[in-house]
């Protein structure tokens, strides 16, 4: 039987990661017992993937319009607006 080591994206721990149910789309969720963060490896919704927020901010800073950013990234225009609106808050 093959064993895959999954590390926490928040604290990088590998020994305290346990399975924590499934998402509504049926993807496996994981829980880190050290920092209590939950995550999943597969995403159904494109805007939930790690790095999406930073890509949206980078495209806005480089002069790409909101509609063009939404079309290129494959997310809705309201998602772009929400990310830009919340970019002043710490993430």
From Swiss-Prot:
It comes from Escherichia coli. Absolutely required for transposition of IS1. The keyword Ion transport does not apply. It comes from the Bacteria. Keywords: DNA recombination, Plasmid, Transposable element, Transposition. GO terms for biological process: DNA transposition. The keyword Disulfide bond does not apply. Pfam families: HTH_Tnp_IS1, Zn_ribbon_InsA. This is Insertion element IS1 protein InsA. The lineage of its organism: Bacteria, Pseudomonadati, Pseudomonadota, Gammaproteobacteria, Enterobacterales. Belongs to the IS1 elements InsA family.
